[in-house]
């Protein structure tokens, strides 16, 4: 088996390649043999040195003969680069999946290790330049002693992937912090709305208690005034109307006596006198003329003198009754005013309570709107984070596709080298 370098005329046998690979193994022993990565690095460096020597000799020979000189570029360790690219992209993909699933920025160990290992491009470039200088003389020893570096550390695409991962972590941290703040805002708005509900209920209860107490007090006061009015009317009937009625009856009887109507008729026993009870309670005895049909002038004169006094007393009873009715009317009016005032006071309390409830409901609406706004902002933020994770996943998929394409190209180049 041999490896051919196109356009150079150089053939390297399998035995010679094995000798070059084994040249740097004496100091490392079995441990270096088991280290596949380091063995591949030494083999690539040795291959580069041999190709360089053969190309230099060929170039000198061609220059001496006057033919056109062909220069070959130094081959890159494609196998190691492709393998490390695959591992790197796979690691980024796993880290991205864990980060998207857990939504916590603490799952970043692998990414931080990659950043610390590969982000220092200056050191990698310096080591790479030093390795190129020593490749022609002491390539195996230089490859063994140099620190393990990856050729893709100089690749801008890989740096972009690292920057994308760091930005994604920072974005996740910012998303979590913002979602926490928005969630707290929504929680505070919900608690404030609940407090407004309690305030509205307390205002309604206070208004109901105050209005009920005021209305009960005024209703009781009005009822007491109405009872006084009824009592005044009852007293006036008892003390004024009844005596007035009795006086009117007595006055009418006396008037009939004066006119000779219903005067006493003498029976066969011929009673000689009649007793008349005055309004003062005094009983007066009058003699009856047995032969006449009219009272004596003396008796008529006595009855006529007492009539005006009786009429005056009748009129005074009527006037006092009217005064009592007026007093009862005032008491009735006070009762009605008290009841009306209680209703008005209750309406005022209800109005003040309704105003307070309206203000509380307005604040409640504001809190509910703030809660809805915070929830909408949180949802929008979460959707933006989801889109960011999708974009990162697409970038990783693109990197995987690029690695796959590089592998395909490398396989094709290797196939061409074998032919």
From Swiss-Prot:
One Pfam assignment: IpaC_SipC
First-listed, main subcellular location of the protein, grouped into a coarse class: secreted
Keywords, comma-separated and alphabetical: Secreted, Virulence
Record localization: Secreted
Region annotation (Disordered) ranges: 62-91, 338-402
Regions of compositional bias (Basic and acidic residues) in chain numbering: 71-91, 380-392
A Gene Ontology term for the protein's cellular component: extracellular region
Origin: domain of life: Bacteria
InterPro entries, per database record: BipC/SctB (IPR005427)
Keyword DNA damage among UniProt keywords: no
Family classification: Belongs to the SctB/SipC family.
Note: Human meliodoisis patients have detectable antibody response to BipC. However, BipC does not act as a protective antigen.
Protein name: Effector protein BipC
Species in which this protein is naturally found: Burkholderia pseudomallei (strain K96243)
């Amino acid at each position: 088996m041999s490896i051919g370098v196109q356009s150079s005329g150089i053939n390297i046998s399998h035995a010679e390649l094995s000798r070059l690979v084994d040249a740097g193994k004496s100091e490392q022993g079995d441990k270096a043999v088991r280290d596949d990565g380091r063995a591949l690095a030494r083999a690539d460096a040795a291959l580069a040195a041999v190709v360089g020597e053969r190309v230099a000799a060929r170039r000198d020979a061609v220059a001496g003969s006057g033919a056109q000189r062909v220069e070959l570029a130094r081959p890159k360790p494609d196998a190691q680069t492709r393998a490390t690219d695959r591992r790197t992209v796979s690691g980024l993909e796993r880290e991205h999946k864990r980060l998207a699933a857990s939504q916590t920025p603490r799952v970043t160990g692998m990414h931080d290790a990659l950043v610390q290992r590969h982000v220092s491009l200056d050191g990698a470039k310096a080591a790479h330049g030093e390795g190129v200088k020593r490749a022609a003389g002491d390539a195996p020893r230089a490859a063994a002693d140099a620190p393990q570096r990856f050729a893709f550390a100089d690749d801008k695409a890989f740096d972009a992937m690292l920057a994308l991962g760091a930005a994604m972590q920072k974005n996740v941290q910012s998303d979590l912090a913002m979602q926490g703040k928005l969630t707290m805002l929504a929680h505070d708005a919900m608690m404030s709305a609940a407090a407004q509900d309690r305030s509205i209920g307390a205002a309604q209860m206070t208004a109901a208690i105050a209005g009920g107490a005021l209305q009960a007090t005024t209703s009781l006061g009005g009822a007491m005034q109405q009872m006084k009015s009824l009592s005044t009317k009852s007293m006036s009937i008892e003390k004024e109307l009844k005596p007035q009625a009795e006086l009117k009856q007595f006055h009418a009887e006396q008037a009939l006596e004066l006119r000779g109507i219903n005067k006493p008729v003498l029976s066969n026993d011929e009673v000689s006198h009649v007793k008349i009870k005055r309004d003062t309670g005094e009983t007066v005895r009058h003699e009856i003329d047995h032969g006449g049909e009219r009272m004596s002038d003396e008796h008529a004169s006595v009855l006529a003198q007492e009539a005006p006094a009786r009429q005056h007393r009748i009129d005074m009873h009527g006037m006092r009754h009217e005064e009592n009715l007026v007093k009862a009317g005032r008491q009735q009016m006070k009762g009605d005013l008290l009841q009306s005032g209680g209703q008005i006071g209750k309406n005022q309390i209800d109005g003040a309570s309704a105003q307070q409830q309206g203000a509380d409901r307005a604040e409640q609406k504001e809190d509910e709107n703030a809660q809805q706004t915070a929830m909408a902002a949180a949802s929008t933020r979460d959707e933006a984070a989801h889109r960011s994770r999708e974009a990162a996943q697409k970038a990783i998929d693109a990197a995987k596709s690029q690695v796959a394409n590089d592998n395909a190209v490398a396989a094709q180049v290797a196939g061409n080298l074998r032919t």
